[in-house]
Regions:
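Single conserved position on a long alpha-helix in the C-terminal lobe of the eukaryotic protein kinase
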Residues: 53-54, 61, 67, 71, ...
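Extracytoplasmic/secreted proteins, especially bacterial periplasmic and envelope-associated proteins
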Residues: 355, 359, 398, 459-460, ...
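Extended, charge-rich low-complexity interaction segments
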Residues: 443-466, 511-539
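Periplasmic/extracellular, small/polar-rich flexible segments of pilin-like filament-forming proteins
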Residues: 855, 859-940
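Structural boundary/hinge residues at secondary-structure and domain interfaces
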Residues: 36-87, 183-185, 189-422, 428-430, ...
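Secondary-structure transition/turn motif
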Residues: 435-439, 457-459, 644-652, 738-739, ...
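Extended, solvent-exposed polar beta/coil surface segments
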Residues: 1-218
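Conserved hydrophobic/amphipathic alpha-helical signal-anchor segments
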Residues: 810-856
Length: 1004
């Protein structure tokens, strides 16, 4: 027994010694590997260095945050990428004599064999860090973030050699022509370009720093200009409507394209100007008759017909809508798309007009304001919109007094930036103008009768005065009257939106399209100037003075053609920031409506003519769009609001929607009864297809998703993985009457004949059920068995071609899937913002404590943490690593069961949300039901959305109840409402459509 214990003791000690030896040996090997893989050549003005660091096994989906720095700020323009190391050769026997035992030979052989086997299966990754540096003395490079390391760099001084005269560029520093240096500098440049492309391909990462630096360095050192377009991006034809739609919506891809365009060197602009082209020749739509006694709200008679019209009917409705946009994502746009930055458009509008809503206004606004509407000629809230607010006063003297007091207070508050209040004359009327030199505040105020108008645009003041003096108004137009026939004032919409044909025509007019592209280029120029200023400070160390455009151009930070523009505008420094000489400060540009020009370049004219020809021939007319929202209580015992939504495109020009007309069959008053336990289902009445060989009747396609736990999102790469995911989906897809798609497949791939119960199985494991005219598919036979009980055609209360129903996803088992998907997207977006801050620190030498403010200034937006936290600056450690920004909501990383944490970085495809995480929209979304109907004269979307009430203070709740009372319960037939007030194009009842079809030989 004593002998056995002694043996165990000796064995334990031996294992402990073995572990220590392995640990010591591994650390020594790592240190030797790092120090043994450093190359550095010193030269003027910059040397170049490259080092390799072992990183273990990394998944291709892993992202790393690594910041490269040194105590003396000698490192410039680092590039980080990843390489797979070559696996070691495995020999059956080693050459040379070797010891059979002793001196660690056995341990060494075991360790080597295990490592070789592992690396043959999964070769380790290497992190390659390349950078330029100043000086020739040894220095220490430090890596911070996902990897902490310190590496000694001892540069080798190369013989002096300058760039050949025919290669040297004017005003650009030369690089050494030593072969060793050129090999390494080419490797650095390739890595730098690849790093920029990776960042550009990340949709959640605004890679403007990398885009600017790659172009600047390429021009400086005569490298080839890289193609930095995103993967899959193609240049669209001028006759494609999407570029114009992108201009109207201000799509980010277009901004990125114009940013890159501003970086390229272009030939001198042609001085030949041509007249601005004519707009498209639009065809006026025929508007149905409206009765003379139709009720039109008086405020609509004060609105120019070319303006959009957003009416709230009361001040409390406006407050509700404002809270909805702020609490449900910060912006209406962010209610649909989770983003890493917020343009704060509500605050911009309040700042421009000086209309910040106070607590007093919230309590007493309805006692002073009887009606209000936001109007404007465009929706470009980010740049400087042409918008205004019309107030219908219950007490005009009190309302004007309140506004005047606010304007006087603003002059005192903003006196340091030159804010002034003055009376000017427009169209013979005295108008109050509150403004600052950079257009941060630009608020015109004018009143007529019981109406007060606040606007950013002088042109809108002129149009308001013209309309109020008797010129045609929006309320007078036949199309608006038709809208009010379909959506009567008596319906008391909490929010009513009307976008007229004239509004859309104005947006695609030559003035708007040409000026919009010009102002987006001006924004890109301001961004480039900001980055050039930071790069100048990083390289020269001069941070206290603001360099001129001439200085930046002469030193190669800006292209020679930077200030060359058709409209003659310039990028100028003013009050410590860059402005456009014609339009003002970014985010507060002069409204497009107030910019006058009659000439344009030949290129601009031709581009617009191409676009105009498309609209004149393909669209021919613009269709008005109207939306109404009403609030109801879903159930008095539940804290859930029901939003009843009606949306119309009417009068409808069917030609431009030919793709929709060809796909949809006529609306019918028949629907398919689907299983009640579906958490999501939809159905659409589709047109049949007839060919010489086959025939498919008009049919209903339907699909549903059960309340079951689906597979974890993101695991669908590869055909087999996708098939496994589809097999695990608790879903079904069907058609009635059977369209026959499957039976046309060759070689019997559509499955054999059904059994007595109607079931058959396809070759990929899909079950099929056929009976009573139905053909339904699912990977789960039990789902089909459940469908067989419920599926049948039944009469519907309304005519429709599309119907969708979504249950309360937050209480379903599907919520885990949505939470995981949203968490991964939010985490990657948050991490992208952190990497932007890293880029400012290591590429442009911005002090860590200033990186956030600089990023927000360059983007003209607030960086927001999509996880719901705040960005905070961590503390630098004792080893002098740089302080890095973090998110206060960043969770401990959890991965899918059966997976392992990445050794470095963050892998969003395998990460799982914390237990208490919930997708933001699941916190307030409680269900929806929508119907789509296309009629000869109208396109209709009607439905309900159930949401949690917006949190308000007790005082605000009391004020709302005293004014409007509690929300009523919805007691109207919403889905049949479009046919009650206007029946000109209502489908006729067709018993044939409602008759149950006979069993046919055609199948799904």
């Amino acid at each position: 027994m004593i002998f056995v214990r002694k043996q165990n003791f000796l064995l334990q000690r031996a294992l402990l010694v073995l572990a220590c030896l392995l640990l010591f040996n591994a650390s020594q090997l790592l240190a030797q590997a790092i120090q043994g893989n450093v190359e550095a050549f010193a030269a003027e003005p910059y040397g170049v260095a490259r080092l390799f660091i072992p990183a273990g096994q990394l998944a291709t989906t892993t992202t790393l945050r690594i910041v490269v720095s040194d105590p003396s700020d000698r490192v410039m323009f680092p590039a980080i990428d990843f390489l797979t190391s070559e696996p070691p050769e495995v020999h059956s026997a080693q050459t040379g004599a070797r010891q059979r035992f002793g001196n660690g030979a056995l341990i060494g052989r075991i360790r080597t064999a295990i490592q070789n086997a592992k690396e043959q299966i999964d070769p380790p990754e290497l992190i390659r860090v390349q950078f330029l540096f100043r000086g020739n003395e040894p220095f220490v490079v430090r890596l911070s973030g996902d990897m902490e390391a310190s590496i000694d760099v001892r540069p080798i001084k190369l013989p002096d050699s300058t760039t050949a005269p025919d290669k040297q560029k004017q005003n650009s520093p030369s690089l050494s022509q030593s072969p060793q240096f050129q090999t390494l500098i080419r490797s650095w440049w390739d890595g730098y370009v690849q790093q920029a492309k990776r960042q550009l391909d990340r949709s959640d990462y605004p890679a403007i720093v990398e885009s600017y630096l790659t172009h600047m360095l390429a021009y400086r050192y005569d490298f080839e200009i890289p193609d930095l377009l995103k993967k899959g991006a193609t240049k669209r034809k001028q006759t494609d409507p999407l570029p114009t739609i992108a201009l109207v919506a201000g799509v980010e891809e277009l901004r990125a394209e114009l940013f890159l365009e501003s970086l390229r060197k272009s030939p001198p602009l042609s001085l030949r100007l041509v007249p601005t082209p004519e707009p498209p020749r639009w065809v006026d739509a025929t508007v149905p008759y409206t009765p003379e006694n139709l009720v039109i709200e008086p405020i609509a008679k004060m609105v120019p017909p070319e303006c959009y019209y957003l009416r709230f009917a009361s001040f409390s409705n406006y407050l509700w809508f404002q809270s909805l946009s702020q609490t449900r994502g910060g912006d209406l746009a962010q209610m649909a798309v989770l983003r890493g930055f917020n343009y704060e458009t509500n605050k911009r509008m309040e700042r421009l007009l000086n209309t910040k809503t106070t607590a007093i206004a919230k309590l007493f606004g309805d006692s002073i304001i009887g009606d209000m509407a936001i109007i404007g000629q465009d929706l470009y809230l980010q740049e400087g919109p042409s918008l205004g607010v019309v107030f219908e006063a219950k007490n005009i003297a009190l309302l004007k007094s309140s506004f005047n007091a606010d304007r006087v207070a603003a002059v005192k508050k903003l006196s340091d930036v030159g804010c002034k209040l003055e009376a000017i004359e427009i169209a013979g009327e005295n108008v109050s103008l509150l403004s600052t030199p950079d257009n941060q505040v630009r608020s015109f105020m004018v009143d007529r009768g019981a109406y007060v108008f606040l606007t950013t645009s002088k042109k809108l003041v002129e149009r308001f005065l013209e309309v109020s003096s008797g010129q045609p108004s929006l309320g007078d137009s036949n199309a608006f009257r038709f809208a009010r026939l379909m959506m009567p004032v008596e319906n008391k919409y909490d929010v009513f939106v009307y976008l007229s044909s004239e509004f859309f025509r104005n947006l695609v007019s030559p003035k708007y399209q040409i000026e919009l592209r010009r102002r987006l280029k001006a924004i890109a120029a301001i961004e480039v100037a900001e980055l050039a200023t930071l790069t100048y400070a990083a390289e020269t160390g001069i941070k206290d003075t603001f360099p001129s455009i001439e200085r930046l151009t002469a030193d190669g930070y800006l292209s020679p053609s930077f200030q060359s523009r058709v409209d003659g505008s310039q990028t100028l420094a003013f009050s410590g920031s860059w402005h456009d000489s014609l339009r003002g400060r970014r985010g507060s540009f002069l409204p497009i409506a107030d910019i006058q020009f009659s000439d344009c370049s030949a290129e601009e004219a031709q581009s617009y003519r191409d676009q105009s020809a498309f609209y004149a021939t393909q669209w021919q007319q613009t269709d008005p769009l109207m939306v109404g929202i009403r609030r109801f209580s879903r159930d008095p015992n539940e804290k859930v609001e029901r939003l009843a939504i009606e949306a119309y495109v009417a009068p409808l020009g069917r030609e431009k929607y030919g793709w929709l007309s060809s796909m949809l069959a006529p609306p019918v008053r028949t629907q398919i009864q689907l299983p009640p336990d579906d958490v999501i289902n939809c159905q659409a009445h589709l047109a049949g297809q007839s060919t010489s060989r086959s025939f498919s009747p008009d049919h209903v396609m339907f699909a549903g998703l059960k309340d079951m736990v689906p597979p974890v999102p993101g695991e669908t790469k590869g055909l087999l993985a996708t098939l496994r995911t589809l097999q695990s989906l608790p879903a079904y897809l069907g058609g009635w009457p059977r369209p026959g798609y499957l039976d046309r497949l060759p070689l019997g791939l559509g499955g054999g004949p059904p059994d007595a119960m109607g079931f058959s199985k396809l070759f990929i494991g899909v079950w099929r059920w056929q009976m009573n005219g139905f053909s339904v598919l699912s990977f789960d036979r039990s789902i089909l068995e459940n469908c067989a009980i419920h599926l049948r055609p039944i009469p519907a209360e309304d005519f429709a071609q599309g119907r969708i129903r979504i249950g309360d996803l937050g209480k379903s088992r599907l919520s885990a899937w949505f939470n995981t998907f949203w968490f991964r997207r939010a985490a990657q977006t948050t991490r992208g913002n952190l990497m932007l801050l890293d880029s400012l620190q290591q590429q442009l030498k911005v002090p860590p404590e200033e990186a956030l403010s600089f990023a927000e200034r360059i983007l003209d937006a607030k960086l927001q943490c999509s996880l719901g936290g705040k960005y905070i600056l961590g503390k630098a450690d004792s080893n002098s690593q740089k302080a890095m920004w973090e998110s206060s909501a960043w969770p401990k990383q959890i991965v899918i069961s059966g997976s392992k944490l990445p050794s470095l970085g963050f892998d969003d495809t395998k990460s799982m949300p914390p237990e208490n995480y919930q997708a933001p929209w699941l916190q307030w979304f409680r269900g929806a039901q929508l119907h789509l109907t296309q009629l000869p004269e109208r396109l209709i979307v009607v439905g309900t959305i159930d949401i949690e009430p917006i949190p308000v203070s007790p005082n605000e709740m009391a004020a709302e109840k005293s004014t409007n009372g509690p929300l009523p319960k919805m007691d109207l037939d919403l889905f049949n409402l479009p046919f009650q007030f206007f029946q000109g194009d209502k489908p006729k009842g067709d018993k044939g459509n409602e008759k149950k079809p006979a069993e046919t030989r055609k199948s799904f």
